[in-house]
Amino acid sequence: MHFNSDFKYAYENGGEITRSFLDALPEDWKNEPLVFDSRVHMLMPGWYPAIPGWHHDDVPRAEIPTGQHFITGGQPDYDNPRYKSEHILGLVNAEICPTEFAIGNCLMPKIKEGDLIYREWHKEVELLIEDNILQKHECEDRYLYHFDWQAFHSGTKAISNGWRWFGRVSRNTERVNKVTNEIRVNCQVYLEFPMEGW
């Protein structure tokens, strides 16, 4: 699994799935600075491969003031973003646990100072879906999905047993200036009811 890798490093050190994903990218993406992340999860029904909840990827955050908790100190800066990131996502075995996007246009409410943006906006997106202002779209297996810093999406809980591969490249982000080319050997899952056992 790759974390914060550039294209060349990911291609040279990735397996067949990683190289297939990178080969399928649009040519203009391959020639720009980008950062690649991937994860492989062994999932069981009810497990989440990512923290669930409607959110955006890589919206610039303010520096965290000394002594302040990262959750409230480093909230996304939607008013004056330093950059506007773009991403391409792909899944293998998506049917086990698809990423969902909320498609459509909406205006989100301003959040009070100190409140958590995505905690509040998650509830708002759910209402917008219920009112058919936004529509849910489940990512399909082995497709590329291009989205940007304003595309609401969420991880979902697994509905069956199996392995799931997730890959994402990002550009127009400060992360391309901080590439670390890491290979990670484990990743976590999240449980809704951790004491129920398995």
What are these regions, as identified by a protein language model?
Residues 121-198:
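Catalytic core of Fe(II)/2-oxoglutarate
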Residues 40, 56-60, 92-96, 149-151, ...:
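Short, flexible loop/turn elements at secondary-structure junctions
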Residues 13-14, 89, 113, 161, ...:
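Feature targets compositionally biased, intrinsically disordered low-complexity regions
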Residues 33-37, 90-91, 102, 144-148, ...:
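A structural signal for short, well-ordered beta-strand segments and their strand-loop junctions
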Residues 48-141, 177-180:
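Catalytic core of non-heme Fe(II) oxygenases with the double-stranded beta-helix
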Residues 1-86:
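Signature of the catalytic double-stranded beta-helix
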